[in-house]
Curated annotation (Swiss-Prot):
Pathway involvement of the protein, from the record: Carbohydrate metabolism; D-tagatose 6-phosphate degradation; D-glyceraldehyde 3-phosphate and glycerone phosphate from D-tagatose 6-phosphate: step 2/2
Pfam family, one: DeoC
Native organism: Streptococcus pyogenes serotype M3 (strain SSI-1)
Gene Ontology biological-process entries: 6-sulfoquinovose(1-) catabolic process; D-tagatose 6-phosphate catabolic process; lactose catabolic process via tagatose-6-phosphate
Record keywords, A-Z: Lactose metabolism, Lyase
SMART domains for the chain: DeoC
EC number(s) given by UniProt: 4.1.2.40
Catalytic activities: D-tagatofuranose 1,6-bisphosphate = D-glyceraldehyde 3-phosphate + dihydroxyacetone phosphate
Annotated S-S bridges: none
Group of enzyme by EC: lyase
One example GO MF annotation: 6-deoxy-6-sulfofructose-1-phosphate aldolase activity
Name of the protein in its database record: Tagatose 1,6-diphosphate aldolase 1
Family membership noted in the UniProt record: Belongs to the aldolase LacD family.
Length: 325
């Protein structure tokens, strides 16, 4: 794979020696739910913006880049560490739960040109995709991603595509039924969107198994032997020639770190992570119940510990994207 000099320059800005140790805080709907669990009533715009600022101030000195949204995160972009790169999200949050299609939608007041002008070093777009889903729906999704890829090509800025797999017939992605399908769903979507017509530079993906069902990682029911889980990671590596990074999917910091060791040992040559809740989730109840100062203390201690430990794991497990580009 070859990229332009400008795209390479931007990728260097969001990584450190070819490893992307990025902090994800573009959550909107999920963050509102987390906040609402600790107070009466919905989270306010000020609450959301302020927590994003706190996280950006305290944790970006230890991240190669931060992913924020332009809806609530623009103030946070102003206080990030100077050496830390910036990814901006282009999609609307959530999806229509009354249908199985989960069609994508851009933020209507934004374009790649505008996100770049707001300081983005890369553009991130999230797509829900069922590789076995309705053919017409998938054609619409593919056309949508082609348009975003073309925008990023025109602006000469890297395109990070986040793929979240699902099955149109299974509502619970954490179920045993979905766990059996997950390797095929995750790796199949990666293969589809690695085609050059989509203009994707980096894939942000799930690990291809639910680690809660992997032999040796659970005390409950097992749905993958160690050998089956290893093969799922090997198949993932074979599914794409593009650099790819892992999302944390809301699991604990400890499980995410253990997963990265397992992935690397299996032969997955991932180039880093975009890690969100595994790093900062514990700050939410502290912020809501005890205020800004206590949240800042949490970020400086436990938040720092989470990101520092993750960086150490990445040093041992991740492969530079420069090996693929």
């Amino acid at each position: 794979m070859t990229i332009t000099a400008n795209k390479r320059h931007y990728l260097e800005k969001v990584s450190h020696q070819g490893i992307i140790s990025a902090l994800a805080f573009d959550q909107r709907g999920a963050l509102k739910q987390m906040m609402a669990a600790h107070q009466e009533g919905e989270a306010t715009v000020t609450q959301i913006e302020t927590l994003k600022v706190l996280v950006s101030e305290e944790l970006t000195p230890y991240a190669s880049s931060i992913l924020l949204d332009p809806e609530y995160g623009l103030l946070a972009t102003k206080v990030k560490a100077n050496q830390t790169g910036l990814l901006l999200a282009y999609e609307k949050t959530g999806y229509d739960a009354t249908t199985t299609s989960r069609l994508p939608d851009c933020l209507v007041e934004w374009s790649v040109k505008r996100l770049k002008a707001a300081g983005a070093d890369a553009i991130k777009f999230l797509l829900y995709y069922d590789v076995d889903g309705d053919e017409q729906i998938n054609l619409q999704k593919q056309a949508y991603i082609e348009r975003i890829g073309s925008e990023c090509t025109a602006e000469d800025i890297p395109f990070f595509l986040e793929l979240l797999s699902y099955d149109e017939r299974i509502s619970d992605n954490n179920s045993a039924a979905y766990a059996k399908l997950k390797p095929h769903k995750v790796n199949g979507a990666m293969s589809v969107f690695s085609d050059k017509r989509f203009g994707v530079d980096v894939l942000k993906v799930e690990v291809p198994v639910n680690m809660a069902y992997v032999e040796g990682f659970t005390e409950g029911e097992v749905h993958y032997s160690q050998a089956e889980a290893i093969k799922a990671f090997q198949d993932q590596e074979a599914a794409s020639h593009l650099p790819y990074i892992y999302l944390s999917a809301g699991v604990s910091a400890k499980l995410f770190q253990e997963t990265l060791y397992f992935a690397a040992a299996a032969g997955a040559q991932f180039s880093g992570v975009l890690c969100g809740r595994a790093t900062w989730a514990g700050s939410v109840p502290v912020y809501i119940t005890k205020g800004e100062d206590e949240a800042r203390k949490w970020l400086c201690t436990e938040g720092f510990q989470n990101i520092d430990e993750l960086n150490r794991v990445l040093e041992e497990t991740a492969s530079p994207w420069t090996e693929k580009i």
